[in-house]
Amino acid sequence: MVLTLSYVAVDKTSIAYAEEAQKESEQMNKEEKADGAVSVSTPSAILMEASTGQVVYEKNCDERRPPASVTKVMTLLLIFDALKDEKIHLTDEVTVSEYAASMGGSQVFLEPGEVQTVDTLIKCISVASANDACVAMAEYVSGDENAFVEAMNQRAKNLGMKNTHFVNCNGLDTDGHETTARDIALMSRELITKYPKIYEYCNIWMEDITHTTKKGTTTFGLSNTNKLIRHYEYATGLKTGSTGKAKFCISATAKKEDVELIAVIMAAEDSKTRNKDAVTLLNYGFGKCQKYAEKTCKTEKAVPVRRGIEKQVKTKQKNPYIYVDTTGADLSGMKRRVRLKKELDAPVKKGEKAGTAEYYLGDKKIGSVDIVAVQDIREIDMKSVFEDLIQLILL
């Protein structure tokens, strides 16, 4: 027996939301142009530029609050870490445990013993915010949810998420399960910049999955909980959440031309306010931010090496320089000054600092990037001297 669930009700809601969102967006644009300022009604929020991590706007962003399903940003980050390390693969088949299937809240109604691929479960988490799929993946990656949550907290610590403590992998209300708008922005930035493949999942608007169990085969329709990806033209993701304690939260990502932003809203009174405030911040950011970004790492002059088997070492800029301006400055006037060390002492290690590239707007220094050695240079020793003498004699 095959059963297909209908999308009709969702479509009507989406149409109504689209019309309302368009009116709100037009009004917000008028308000922002009027005074250039921005404000949101929700108690905690942050706007971050993704490539640099620069904070463009903040409001009580270090207050600890329950994040609801925005927790799943970290769950997805650990899943993608495991994929990168080849501990798991998208085609792997995951057997759903009785515990995973028992999860309440938003779910895709997985049943004990049901088998789904990693790829499908990522869709269930990203699109439908499925709590049961989260636990199934946590158990598959780490053996059990507790071990997975320990890994979540360690990853948070490594990212500098100073005010975060996870108790579960899906964000269901639990005492002590808290984070902040700033910390959500940090983990969101890590996910989208390190694993842009996440966009392939969180931009799915609707898609069917198939349940195959002892009861038979049924088709279940996934519908994206993040309405912004359909109704805000620059939206790219990322994750919504709502519970009784957390109220309405979102980590909203968007990109316009070369500027990519992360807007985090926590504890909004309803989904309308949550989405409106997210769009307000994103529009504000796109109006304020302009970006200077180098595409390649420039090669610099060689630096002399004292007591090295090579007399000099080649150097290059460690990484391309990126700068985000919010003041309206003329970035075409950006100046670059290179300061190399007079010499390096052997042994020289690849990646060792050999100088600095400094960036100026007018007389103001706005940033710098290290210039590093591109190779190892060993210190000269008697063996090296003897080998050189032999070469000279043979010549």
Where are these regions (language model features)?
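A generic local structural motif
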Residues: V2-T4, E31-K33, C249
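Active-site-adjacent loops and short helices of periplasmic peptidoglycan-processing enzymes
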Residues: K12-Y199
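Sec-dependent N-terminal signal peptides of Gram-positive bacterial secreted proteins and lipoproteins
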Residues: M1-I15
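Domain-terminus/edge residues, biased toward the C-terminal soluble/receptor-binding domains
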Residues: M161-K162, D173-E178, R182-L395
